[in-house]
């Protein structure tokens, strides 16, 4: 099963971003899933103090490259996992990813605490399932893949 991982990036430190994506990707791979990550081929950003939504010139991080690659990865996934917890700011990228996933008929699993700014009718209607905790969402994905996560 292929799964696209979406989570707010802008405003977070590179350590926060890479730590999250590395951990989630590892757990999903242990269940035999193939994770698609917006951080693919961006390891050179590990030293960034704060992640920005624009202004990068590296070929894999131009606005066009990010938009097209993330859209391609999402369109080739079976499940889209959107974690809206711990965001530093509203994520326009995540909202695009959620909209693309809905338009493409993907199975959408969202994690949100249900508070503003993500307590919104569009998110609630686009999501197939909304969890309030990351652990509960991962447990569901584990059951969907018929396996147990190994820490």
Identify what each model region corresponds to.
Residues 1-151:
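Conserved catalytic or regulatory cores that recognize and/or transform ribose-phosphate-containing ligands
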């Amino acid at each position: 099963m292929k799964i696209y991982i979406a989570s707010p990036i802008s405003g977070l430190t590179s350590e926060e971003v890479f730590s999250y994506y590395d951990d989630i990707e590892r757990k999903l791979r242990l269940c035999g899933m193939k994770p698609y990550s917006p951080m693919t081929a961006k390891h050179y950003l590990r030293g960034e103090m704060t992640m920005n939504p624009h202004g990068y010139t590296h070929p894999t991080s131009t606005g066009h490259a990010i938009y097209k690659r993330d859209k391609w990865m999402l369109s080739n996934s079976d499940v889209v996992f959107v974690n809206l917890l711990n965001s530093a700011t509203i994520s326009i990228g995540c909202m695009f990813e959620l909209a693309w996933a809905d338009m493409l008929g993907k199975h959408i699993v969202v994690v949100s605490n249900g508070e503003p700014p993500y307590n919104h009718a569009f998110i609630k209607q686009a999501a197939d399932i909304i969890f309030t905790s990351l652990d509960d969402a991962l447990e569901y994905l584990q059951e969907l893949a018929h396996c147990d996560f190994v820490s």
